[in-house]
Curated annotation (Swiss-Prot):
Region spans: Glycosyl hydrolase-1 2: 517-955
Top-level enzyme category: hydrolase
TM stretches of this protein: 984-1004
Protein EC: 3.2.1.31
Highest classification ranks of the organism: Eukaryota, Metazoa, Chordata, Craniata, Vertebrata
Organism (species): Macaca fascicularis
Extracellular side: 36-983
Cytoplasmic face of the membrane: 1005-1014
UniProt note: domains: Contains 2 glycosyl hydrolase 1 regions. However, the first region lacks the essential Glu active site residue at position 241, and the second one lacks the essential Glu active site residue at position 874.
Catalytic activity: a beta-D-glucuronoside + H2O = D-glucuronate + an alcohol
Alphabetic keyword roster: Cell membrane, Glycoprotein, Glycosidase, Hydrolase, Membrane, Repeat, Secreted, Signal, Transmembrane, Transmembrane helix
UniProt protein name: Klotho
Gene Ontology BP annotations: carbohydrate metabolic process; fibroblast growth factor receptor signaling pathway
């Protein structure tokens, strides 16, 4: 480790006069222009447009060499030992021991001490007991692999009375031991002088920070720390979050010392804090920097705010919001020594004035910009009126860009950042981990994409502790602390393991599994498109009236019916259905080889049985499939799909209990028989049931549904397969379920449980054992739930193996966690918390785009059910309501199909086809590859991109061996007789030809003979 703080990144040296022209060119092309106050307002316009999908998702890259990786803690939150070894009382000791909490305080909840009184407030008396566990804490640092550790010195521990005098030797010894241990580990300290815990003696004697005299006491305390510890400390923080200290300590009273004063008092305290900070900076700069070589700053917290509407007024309000929180302290220090103009204009009677000498004294008193950004400081303690009716957002990247523009490109050290989980959450803190990932990724984007000079990042905090106004109701540590235990052992959470891996890799380096694969699919690969319910329009394009009419030309100018005269009934043809040909044309334009759609059971059999058959609808479907075959597109037909109303069932069956009624299974088998009989000559791929949704289906309904599928399969297998030579299976929705915490065995078990309930419930009886998954049965039995029916041995034999291929629909990936964090998304039935990685790209309907989930679910199915032929029967994403340029879908298809290729080539998955969802926006709004507007279908960019992939049969590259695929021709089933009997056909043709020639000769010579006779 270097002995001194790393130097600032080098700036270009001033060029000589002889290079003045070059200076101008470099200044325009390379040097960053000087920023001025107010320039930060450009940030909102810059980020107003959504980023391209490839930029919005996972960002791969590493941080600059020498980047500072830190973790932090604060004295009162973690040290404990509040009366040990001569420590004086702080304002937080007094504040937490007070029986009445201020308004909005929740510290009484979740008291860790186990005290019987529910009204006893939580305190930091013991907290994480860091005062007695230096080795324990530093071992945690070693596990993380951080380069820096931020901690604060308890003012009352080194100076019990707060003022200069004889320091507390035991307090000094504790911090020396900590610093020495850090030196042994090669971890550099980042030391905060004041983290909210003012000695109570100074509060009583002077009224705390409301008294200007406190600045001198703070200077004396800082001098003591610089003298005793400065040789080992290269980064100093004077005051942590002066906004919270001033506003919530002295104006709202939400935090210690709990003074519910006027806003004027809050602004006065902030004024004194700025002067106190400046005094300490000048002290270090004059007396200690020459020998110690460190840097000093102040930790400023901020929120981020977005305009309700992208108007000049809303943007000005956002700028004002940041001025009132961050700019309140940042502008005096980093710009000109005075408050933001927006504050002075709005608070002229409340805001104290700086003298000219004070402005000069405060200006420039920071060697780097120390930024805090987190839930408590940036959001929970943000006064509502300081939002100015705009929308706060946890967007760290935008804030970093704003600071860069507003304060002239400072070096930024993020000295506090993180999130929180519930106080009941133990070590699987998935929510915290993904927020940590999001914030670090946004920091990397700010560095790489926006050019912001961020030099370090601090995760908050090292361990669970006392969380100020929230007490112990939340946890923010990377290490878990059992506050009820005597030992207070630190146990790494998932977030700690994640942070350790991230530091080890210095960011998010590109991983081999995330790289696209070049290659092509087999020649007979099925490229399909899905339209769950095609446009059924039985209106004929020709006249169907059999009557004869005369045109009354001379009088009424109308058609007059001729009574008693009718024409012969005209035979109907498929071309009569006007709606079919436009759909066929669009499919041909897409170059797909297969088209999947669902039949409407309720339209074909309105009563659910063959007592009333809609032959017109059947003729329409028959024409649809025959026309598809004619143009060499293979129809893939689903018999049933759950859809409102009536779950896609005939109304009578729905009223009689739907799938709860065993009779529905028998009715389905008869319906299937009719469809096979009427359509089977043209349909070679059948789906019995498409995506039966297991999450809202009862066990008895699922039981009957499985039997219905099996009955239909056996009908086809025994009565139609030999003549029609088709294949039949069921299509199951198979979204991937990923453990939220990849390091947690419990989360892995939870993920497997959900997969069995979501997919295995219907898949295991068909593709596996013939019975329900044992995981499912065992879980329900443990909870005394005996509603899952049992199959008889005959039923198992009936159901098992009723497939010719495995068809799955896949759209997204869901994370599951064993910890109950969000009651709204918690599934009590399966004891699982569903969540998402907030760094994932999402569609407008908040469906996560996770391409690698498709590959994982394909491998899971292969592992569970063997090397079966598989079809991805549906895969797609929604776009914006008026999105003509559907770049999200282009990105989605490109990456999901590439993952399918990886599964086929790298994993040996027997993948036979891919079907994109959906055909058009008319039948599936916001999902279509064709846009429907003004009664016309217009191709979206995604359709053209899909066509390109189809034409290439995948993703061929320079290293890919070209695969020759012979062109396929339409097979005419009606002409098969002639194809198999070519010699006979030739002989008949010869006889016909000879007959014609003979007839011609006879005619010729007979005519010639008549002429001669005449």
């Amino acid at each position: 480790m270097p002995a001194s703080a790393p130097p600032r990144r080098p700036r270009p040296p001033p060029p000589s006069l002889s290079l003045s022209l070059l200076l101008v060119l470099l200044g325009l092309a390379g040097r960053r222009l000087r920023a001025e106050p107010g320039d930060g307002a450009q940030t909102w316009a810059r980020f107003a447009r959504p980023p391209a999908p490839e930029a919005a998702g996972l960002f791969q890259g590493t941080f600059p060499d020498g980047f500072l990786w830190a973790v932090g803690s604060a004295a009162y939150q973690t040290e404990g030992g509040w009366q040990q070894h001569g420590k004086g009382a702080s304002i937080w000791d007094t504040f937490t021991h007070h029986p009445l909490a201020p308004p909005g305080d929740s510290r009484i909840a979740n008291v860790p001490s186990g005290a019987p009184s529910p009204l006893q407030p939580a305190t930091g008396d013991v907290a994480s007991d860091s005062y007695n566990n230096v080795f324990r804490d530093t071992e945690a640092l070693r596990e993380l692999g951080v380069t820096h550790y931020r901690f604060s010195i308890s003012w009352a521990r080194v100076l019990p009375n707060g003022s200069a005098g004889v320091p507390n030797r035991e307090g000094l010894r504790y911090y020396r031991r900590l610093l020495e241990r850090l030196r042994e580990l090669g971890v550099q300290p980042v030391v905060t002088l004041y983290h909210w815990d003012l000695p109570q003696r100074l509060q009583d004697a002077y009224g705390g920070w409301a008294n200007r005299a406190l600045a001198d006491h703070f200077r004396d305390y800082a001098e003591l720390c610089f003298r005793h510890f400065g040789g080992q400390v290269k980064y100093w923080i004077t005051i942590d979050n002066p906004y919270v200290v001033a506003w919530h300590g002295y104006a709202t009273g939400r935090l210690a010392p709990g003074i519910r004063g006027s806003p004027r008092l809050g602004y006065l305290v902030a004024h004194n804090l700025l002067l106190a900070h400046a005094k300490v900076w000048h002290l270090y700069n004059t007396s200690f920097r020459p020998t110690q070589g460190g840097q000093v700053s102040i930790a400023l917290s901020s929120h981020w705010i977005n305009p309700r509407r992208m108007t000049d007024h809303s943007i000005k309000e956002c700028q004002k919001s940041l001025d009132f929180v961050l700019g309140w302290f940042a502008k005096p220090i980093f710009i000109d020594g005075d408050y933001p103009e927006s504050m002075k204009n709005n608070l002229s009677s409340l805001l104290p004035d700086f003298t000219e000498s004070e402005k000069k004294f405060i200006k420039g008193t920071a060697d780097f910009f120390a930024l805090s950004f987190g839930p408590t400081l940036s959001f929970q303690l943000l006064d509502p009126h300081m939002k100015f009716r705009q929308l706060e957002s946890p967007s760290l990247r935008q804030l970093l860009s704003w600071i860069d523009l507003e304060y002239n490109h400072p070096q930024i050290f993020i000295v506090e950042n993180g999130w929180f989980v519930s106080g009941t959450t133990k070590r699987d803190d998935a929510k915290y981990m993904y927020y940590l990932k999001k914030f670090i990724m946004e920091t990397l984007k700010a560095i790489k994409l926006d050019g912001v000079d961020v030099i370090g990042y601090t995760a908050w905090s090292l361990m669970d502790g006392f969380e100020w106004h929230r007490g112990y109701s939340i946890r923010r540590g990377l290490f878990y602390v059992d506050f009820l235990s005597q030992e207070k052992t630190l146990l790494p959470k998932s977030s700690a393991l994640f942070y350790q891996k991230l530091i080890e890799k210095n960011g998010f380096p590109p991983l081999p599994e995330n790289q696209p694969l070049e290659g092509t699919f087999p020649c007979d690969f099925a490229w399909g498109i899905v339209d769950n319910y095609i446009q059924v329009d039985t209106t004929l394009s020709q006249f169907t009236d059999l009557n004869v009419y005369l045109w009354d030309v001379h009088h009424s100018k109308r058609l007059i019916k001729v009574d008693g005269v009718v024409t012969k009934k005209r035979k109907s043809y498929c071309v009569d259905f006007a709606a079919i040909q436009p759909q066929i044309t669009l499919l041909q334009e897409m170059h797909v080889t297969h088209f999947r759609f669902s039949l409407d059971w309720a339209l074909i059999l309105p009563l659910g049985n063959q007592s009333q058959v809609n032959h017109t609808i059947l003729q329409y479907y028959r024409c649809m499939v025959s026309e598809l075959v004619r143009v060499n597109i293979t129809p893939v037909v689903a018999l049933w799909q759950p859809v409102a109303p009536n779950q896609g069932l005939p109304r009578l069956l729905a009223r009689q209990g739907a799938w709860e009624n065993p009779y529905t299974a028998l009715a389905f088998a008869e319906y299937a028989r009719l469809c096979f009989q009427e359509l089977g000559h043209h349909v070679k791929l059948w789906i019995t049931m498409n995506e039966p949704y297991t999450r809202n289906m009862t066990y008895s309904a699922g039981h009957n549904l499985l039997k219905a599928h099996a009955l239909a399969w056996h009908v086809y297998n025994e009565k139609f397969r030999h003549a029609q030579n088709g294949k039949i299976s069921i299509a199951l929705q198979a979204d991937w379920i990923e453990p939220a915490c990849p390091f947690s065995q419990k989360d892995k078990e939870v993920a497997e449980r959900v997969l069995e309930f979501d997919i295995g419930w219907l898949a295991e009886p068909i593709f596996g054992s013939g019975d329900y998954p044992w995981v499912m049965r065992d879980w329900l039995n443990q909870r005394n739930n005996f509603l899952l029916p049992y199959f008889t041995e005959d039923e198992k034999k009936l159901i098992q193996g009723t497939f010719d291929f495995l068809a799955l629909s896949h759209y997204t990936t869901i994370l599951v966690d064993s910890e109950k964090e969000d009651p709204i998304k918690y599934n009590d039935y399966l004891e699982v918390q569903e969540m998402t990685d907030i760094t994932w790209l999402n569609s407008p309907s908040q469906v996560a785009v996770v391409p690698w989930g498709l590959r994982k679910v394909l491998n899971w199915l292969k592992f569970k059910y063997g090397d079966l032929p598989m079809y991805i029967i549906s895969n797609g994403i929604d776009d914006g309501l008026h999105a003509e340029d559907d770049q999200l879908r282009v990105y989605y298809m490109q990456n999901y199909i590439n993952e399918a290729l990886k599964a086929h080539i790298l994993d040996g998955i027997n993948l036979c086809g891919y079907f994109a969802y959906s055909f058009n926006d008319r039948t599936a709004p916001r999902f279509g590859l064709y846009r429907f507007a003004a009664d016309q279908f217009e191709p979206k960019p995604s359709m053209k991109h899909y066509r390109k992939i189809i034409d290439s049969n995948g993703f061929p590259g320079p290293e890919t061996l070209e695969k020759f695929c012979p062109e396929e021709f339409t097979v005419c089933t009606e002409c098969s007789f002639f194809h198999t009997r070519k010699p006979l056909v030739a002989f008949i043709a010869f006889l016909f030809f000879a007959f014609i020639v003979s007839l011609s000769l006879i005619f010729y010579y007979s005519k010639k003979g008549r002429r001669r006779y005449q």
